[in-house]
Amino acid sequence: MKTENYLCIDIGGTNIKYAILNNAGNIIQNDKIKSIHNKKGFLNQIDKIIDQFKGLKGIAFCAPGKVQDNTIYFGGSLPFLDGINFNNRYNELKVPIAVINDGKASVLAENWLGSLKDLDNCAAITLGTGLGGGIIVNGRLLSGVHAQAGEVSFMKLTDQKYDDKIAGLQYSAVQM
């Protein structure tokens, strides 16, 4: 079987981590850079990362915030991500591009190759610059009607109608 390489980019509030993985999930190479917290600077960083690699079979992004139809909404701890659609931006590369919430990506990765391998029902919680999570039920990633099921960063912390105390905005494992 021919080895195919994929670029995986983890967008975080502190760092952007990236790796080349083969189709078996083995890391071929990886690195990280400090996150820039404005849209223009951030997109320049992503452009430079992608420009390093040729012959990719696909690119996967995981990011905080709501992700629906490969578009990031709200951006969680990185609000400047709101509205970014990597498929539109990198369409000329002619490779599949996937975008997923970072908490959901963590549970999928653990279920594929990690400590939750092959479990039909499992959950993961991520602690970083923000909080995140994902849930797998009956072997399927739980998405929900608003594409945010299992993302603990969007959990309300009070019963007020308007709640500015949402877990992902108020708490950070980095700050603990």
Language model regions located:
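Active-site glycine-centered loops adjacent to acidic/histidine catalytic or metal-binding residues
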Residues: 10, 102, 128
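Short glycine-rich anion-binding loops that position phosphate/pyrophosphate groups of nucleotides
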Residues: 64-67, 128-130
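Conserved phosphate-binding loops in N-terminal lobes of ATP-dependent enzymes
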Residues: 2-63
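Hydrophobic "anchor" residues
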Residues: 27, 72, 141-142
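Residue-level detector of high-confidence beta-strand sites
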Residues: 30-32, 75, 144
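Glycine/GP-enriched mid-protein hinge/lid loop-to-helix segment characteristic of carbohydrate kinases
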Residues: 19-23, 39, 98, 113-176
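Glycine-rich phosphate-binding loop and adjoining helix at the ATP-binding site
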Residues: 36-47, 55-59, 65-121, 162
